[in-house]
Amino acid sequence: MKFARSGAAVSLLAAGTLVLTACGGGTNSSSSGAGGTSGSVHCGGKKELHSSGSTAQENAMEQFVYAYVRSCPGYTLDYNANGSGAGVTQFLNNETDFAGSDVPLNPSTGQPDRSAERCGSPAWDLPTVFGPIAITYNIKGVSTLNLDGPTTAKIFNGTITVWNDPQIQALNSGTDLPPTPISVIFRSDKSGTSDNFQKYLDGASNGAWGKGASETFNGGVGVGASGNNGTSALLQTTDGSITYNEWSFAVGKQLNMAQIITSAGPDPVAITTESVGKTIAGAKIMGQGNDLVLDTSSFYRPTQPGSYPIVLATYEIVCSKYPDATTGTAVRAFMQAAIGPGQEGLDQYGSIPLPKSFQAKLAAAVNAIS
């Protein structure tokens, strides 16, 4: 978590639970939207919500909860960042009011049907938090590096083994790359970051990756380290190394980040709120109605120049109609706060504020929660 705010009390428990409570009582209504789309927060319902799930959402959730309690004094939300799988399980077991997840509900395991039984209505997957994944590197004397999908795939599967390989050098004219051996560093733990990074390699490499994607790194080369902290620490002490990190860790650790050449044009693209915002705005929805499941393959081969292609989309999984109306009212208010005032300064937490066009799509679904 980043910091505690004035006017609210924050406590982080050992289990990774965030509890943020505003001072004051009654209900309030506010309108805002860092992405540019304003919307009211209609406070009401039960006073304390419970949610759990994605650790990738943890920092953004602090901002969302802060926006909620500021908009609705006297209301709280308790979020336990215990992992996507645990969060979905607790939601399906009716132990929490909604779940945070790096992936939408999985039809192959019957999760949509189980959620419909739990809710008494269809559950909706609402993509709310978008975090770029950075390719980070440590090469002595090299401060800028351009990569594309095929070249990155060949690095991470061991096909390219030295930094001055002609395929890398061709993308970096004007930079004298050394003959240093490449040291690949990967996540040794199961990770949504690994899954999404490998989906990028699979989707953007024109067949050069050939390893598929999963929460376990499949490249077959390199050294593993646990978590973003572990990979970052090993990168910083290893000349010639390369890894992948959530953007917030790359910024926080002051790591060098590669710029990515995409299918949309020859110009390398860095991570910025604008470049990731273009990716989000161009996201294709393959869910039906207000179930906003994304086709993330559209991220990896963008058509709009200046779009950054490696982005992790995470979801809030909610009931479309809650058995208890007071819960539905409160969840709707929280989500209104999250996609409205909660977007302000979200990039300081490692996530990208929603662009106007996508914010409007999400608002229509959020406002329909009951």
From Swiss-Prot:
Top-level taxon: Bacteria
GO molecular function list: phosphate ion binding
Record carries keyword Transport: yes
UniProt GO BP: phosphate ion transmembrane transport; phosphate ion transport
Effect of a null allele: No growth phenotype in phosphate-rich medium (3.6 mM Pi). In restricted medium (Sauton) grows better than wild-type even after nutrient starvation. Decreased phosphate uptake in phosphate-depleted medium. Decreased growth in infected BALB/c and C57BL/6 mice for up to 5 months after infection.
Membrane topology according to the record: Lipid-anchor
Protein name, as recorded: Phosphate-binding protein PstS 2
Taxonomic source organism: Mycobacterium tuberculosis (strain ATCC 25618 / H37Rv)
